Amino acid sequence: KNFSKEACREVVRLLGNAGYVSVADDVNMENYEEVETFYQAYVKAHDAEVTIFQVHSDGLLGVLTFIHREGSLQTYYVGVDWKEGGMPYIKNTLVSDIAKITYTPKGYLIYTYKEDIVHSDANQYLRVKPQSDACRELTRKYVSGIRFADYDAFVTSWDSSTVEDILEPCLFEDLYRIHTGESIRTESGWIPAEEYERIMMLYLPVTKEQIRRKCGYDAQRGSYPYEMIFAEPYAPFGEVVDFTENADGTITLTVDGVCIDKEMDCAFTNELVVQPFADGTFRYLSNQSNFFTSNRSFKI
């Protein structure tokens, strides 16, 4: 209970200082070189193993060991929970055979189990190589709240002169979450025009007239229909890998699209320009997408 992000980072750091490989979501892996050493041994068909401590946001600890022996690759997982008073106990264990494992140029360890695990994606992954604090923070602020499937805005090129082309009703759901920090709730299935247009015009260089043309405005109701996003499985996600602070106060973000399902740590690259405002909000001004694969099946 009350396990903060700061506490999570501190546990990862303490485990790292003690010599263990440790990681958490949005936290760089400590002693990541041991994972690279393991993979190099695996590629050379040498026996090897490495243990990784995964600190979860709820305070649980996952201990994941990769073992390569005589051509066979397995993981042995131990889940550790806590009793009252802080006493640890083993909550569950699991041994799984791995069908294949890949280490990408940017440092993603991607692996696939021979048998499907319930509530698990087809491919699993760990971010091994560290990211800079600046790029990680820019990812959190400008990229983590958007999608690279389900709508076209961040998998196509546009600017202020063509922004109307990317307007879709389902865009509002993510922009609302970015703005409020909460998921949208509507009992009637309609969103008041004032709120809808205010948020859309804040985060995109669009006019009220453009929004009304493209997003289903109902003049009689003075509202827009709520269009729920049904998330695409195995969708790519973005990470900022470089950035430029421009003289006009805007920031140009270089955003790589990571597609774990296709074992690609850079399926496409975006040059995304954002304009930060003094109150902490911002606006997406333009996007330039460059794809490095002809297979864009993750794009609706």
Annotate each predicted stretch with a short phrase.
Residues 1-300:
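Mature, Sec-exported extracytoplasmic domains of Gram-positive
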